Amino acid sequence: MSGLPQGRPTFGAAQNVSAVVAYDLSAHMLDVVAQAAEARQLKNITTRQGYAESLPFADNAFDIVISRYSAHHWHDVGAALREVNRILKPGGRLIVMDVMSPGHPVRDIWLQTVEALRDTSHVRNYASGEWLTLINEANLIVDNLITDKLPLEFSSWVARMRTPEALVDAIRIYQQSASTEVRTYFALQNDGFFTSDIIMVDAHKAA
């Protein structure tokens, strides 16, 4: 199973496995994936709409679940991860990629604010320690955790989410008022460019 956005994990997985289910809350996003799959002649992709916290699949149904930059939209990450555990086969893998909270309160509130202004469906980015706790509490076993920095060019970053102009202006005003600590940590530039922390966690369900 592949969690979106924009189908990238879906298309990559479809070239290596017999069947992929692209799952998302957004009907529009699923339509985009279905059309792109047809254009690429990928016939092993199906789509399903729903919430991460209530997956409409049988127990032990999937070999792998991939979520790429979607978990920060989930309203209850713990519940979603417990659902992932339920639908994974014994020994099945979970791969989660997302923007990561820096953990430090001042930096965290800055990141959450610009994320929410850019996309009002944003709920929260989590720190690495929070991810480890949530995955452990879902009875999944972490095999690997990688963090990195993601450079973000401002114009394309807001364009991807079709952020309304008023909120784009609000982000720029908020950026311009950032403290020296925030500017340094996020490598914030005068043109709006900045970097975000990202995380990838590879975990599995006990066999």
Curated annotation (Swiss-Prot):
Pfam families, sorted: Methyltransf_11
GO MF entry, a single one: S-adenosylmethionine-dependent methyltransferase activity
CDD domains found in the cross-reference section: AdoMet_MTases
Family to which this protein belongs: Belongs to the methyltransferase superfamily.
Protein name: Uncharacterized protein YafE
Gene coding for it: yafE
